[in-house]
């Protein structure tokens, strides 16, 4: 991933430049697990306003003018659409995006939907948790909640339908920025899924965790709308089926909070009066749900990533690949039961040699970005 604007976590005080109101999270100290989740649900429900779905340029349409403007990639003031943004376009004012949208209605020169016949026609309102999972457009305030309803290309949104997010084995459709539709390769679910690009997987994961926290008192009632594609599990506590929870935890870990998310969280708070706590305090994800597991069967090992020596006899290994490894900000090492046993920050800043901590003899998976490989400690 290429989030050059990732902000380094600075402990319990949250992220640099995050504007968390003083006292907003009072009462959370010492809590963990579902007790913490319930306390957060109370906090982010108090003060939350229903700003409406919107007609004309009102409701969510109005919110997007402050929550989803590009100040990070091209920095050109267009709408950030996570289904079309090309993060390789890193020169301010220069776009490699397949298409771009201006905020506002067509009558005022904007690209708000409207009808569409293909990619790039217009942007609409995408429920990252599909509204069919919780009762449709008339289920309020959730269908109007800007924290998980985002502007995206209308056509790509329609290609998603109500598929859950996931990781695709073989794409049956691919958008112009690499977003995919296809059968799931995630253990526990074999249906069709919609896979966003790596740059935004953590964003969507934290939206899902926000949803099952903000609306935890409604989750059992959402069971009446359960479909084969819905990853909600009908429980107030965990909120998500295990396969989906594990995926969201993995994405949240692999794609850390960015300045874009921090700014969006602040703007959403100004707009509707509540915050996404997992952007302000990403450590709460693990404190509530635990660590992300990675089953060995989930790893299709990359031929273009190698470790030497292998088997490993000391604690120094050299990693080579056919990509520039400096683009990867973390290396994760898992054991064969899927536990994360070591995380290495900025591993390739000074070369391709990394130091393992004292790992017991056995088989391990090393993962960086979308690349992974198996190695043995002897």
List the model feature ranges, each with a label.
Residues 17-48:
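Boundary/junction segments of secreted and surface-exposed precursor proteins
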